[in-house]
């Protein structure tokens, strides 16, 4: 009995010692000026801005996986498009009178020009190397069929010619011309089918994972930057001086440490909402999230890959979210060309591809459950669409592919599960809750913590989104002469609009193309097209948009 008692006492002492050691470890505070949560392109971009603006600031980046850029920024987990509205028809909605609205397209294109300038500047500084490893010229095309859709594309093309950002776009309804642009799309197609296409040579395919890895590798060269992998944030607590104490667990050895930061950025993709809620700031109460995944069909067969050099976007079918538009894309991944077709929507309660099935449930609170219910009730068409997508069979997906590639063979394609996209649901005074497409920077009033929510257009606009964050949380510094000069060196067009200024547009496109090794020819005269017949549009309930 004495032996048993002694053994139990010994175990208790041992366990207590382990517990005390863990507490001691957690109590050892690391201090940093900026804490970046998440090792994706958003954190990498913000860190790169701050490194130039305030080189003496210390920065710590924590990432729960074993490497950076392994979630949504990973090249295989997104479409890899340099979104600039050259081909994405959802950015040019049709008004009730049949005319085309281009405001959203212009804004998206302006944003991507900022990203191009940011990347070009980093190449010139030696931060980014070998541009072909992360960005390549791939023409962007819109392709439609049927009388109404052809008429829509005519009207869209005519409307976009009013903007300096879309000069150089080509238009054709000729089968032979379109076949020259995208042979894979036209071969085997009914020669009597009415089709139309636009093509812009300066489109791009971007590997956001590679950009992320290179940006972070450059940050790591400085002694006042620390990267902690396999590290998960477990708690955030505001201190009396408005700094933050963030508890971070080491997923490999189970220990924990506290990091005291003057500013915290939550760039954790799908996990950002839960961490924002954990912070306890009142601004977080307005938000909820709904996860949607995406799948692509992938071909690596040289007979397919070498026969297609374009990103070809179609038009979303009636009743489907505008952003769900199918596309067949040339991609450059892991140093080789592949072709992807999709996306097909999938559903999982995970907020991250490497997340937990409890993510959706654990993010649902008393303050956001009603907005979520209102969104579900108000968007039954969207619910129907998601259910229909989840129910798709292998044959259904292949038939969808054949609409864009009539001579496709099943054996050339495999299914790939891409990343999760958490859609923003925001409290609304009139509707209770609304589904918000796009990204949103949410910060506290003091400007000590900020999170990025949302999924589209995402990585392609990381540079302007983080610029917006700087203006929101570091407003006084942004207006200072020092920061203004640095920001204009990073983004030459900062503070100006390129749209409407032909000379400035061409100057920036030529500069970024030269530095990034991209194709750019001075735009020629616009193609002549049949005059679009603008028909008043029937009144229909708008389908909420989502990002896939």
Swiss-Prot record:
Pathway: Carbohydrate metabolism; tricarboxylic acid cycle; oxaloacetate from (S)-malate (quinone route): step 1/1. It is an enzyme of class 1 (oxidoreductase). Residues 530-541 have a biased composition (Low complexity). It comes from Escherichia coli O81 (strain ED1a). GO terms for biological process: tricarboxylic acid cycle. Gene3D superfamilies: D-Amino Acid Oxidase, subunit A, domain 2 (3.30.9.10), FAD/NAD(P)-binding domain (3.50.50.60). GO terms for molecular function: 2-hydroxyglutarate dehydrogenase activity; L-malate dehydrogenase (quinone) activity. Keywords: FAD, Flavoprotein, Oxidoreductase, Tricarboxylic acid cycle. It holds the Pfam family Mqo. This is Probable malate:quinone oxidoreductase. Belongs to the MQO family. Residues 521-548 are annotated as: Disordered. Its cofactor is FAD. It catalyses: (S)-malate + a quinone = a quinol + oxaloacetate. Its EC number is 1.1.5.4.
